[in-house]
Amino acid sequence: VISTLLVAHPWFSPVVLAVLVLGGPVAGRWLYWRPRTAWTVFAASLLPIVLLTLVPTSREVLERCAVSWYLPTFGRVELMANVILFVPPVLLAAVASRRPVVALVGGVVGSAAIEAVQALSPGLGRSCDTNDWLTNSIGAVIGAALAWAAIWAARRWPRRIGTTGRR
């Protein structure tokens, strides 16, 4: 269903990525001062990953693991979707923990773990793919870079003492 939507609307993935790149550091700077909220939103951002990668499907797995190394382009909608999938959780975890490198490693290792589960659990109806790991890892790098920018901005322009952040 999601692949069909993305193929029908090829502009969707680039727009979402642009929103994340432009809005991520701004939202991250705001969340820097609200780590509890950042952790809550981080937990919510894991839901699409679980639903799209670990929920069983009815399809039959024809091959256990596919080995391919294609870089994402705007024309390859599924690859772009895999990139986008990992940007928010890594961004949010990095801002909440104030450790972009740790969040980046978590995203890369988490993606590898998902692919391992898919490879070892044929009953899921999903097959592992090295390209999924690659594109998820690219998304994790983007998320960590955006978090670094947000953390830098929050430290460079700290909120004023005595303000609640509400207007």
Task: Give the residues covered by each predicted segment.
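Loop-to-transmembrane alpha-helix initiation sites
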Residues: C128-W133
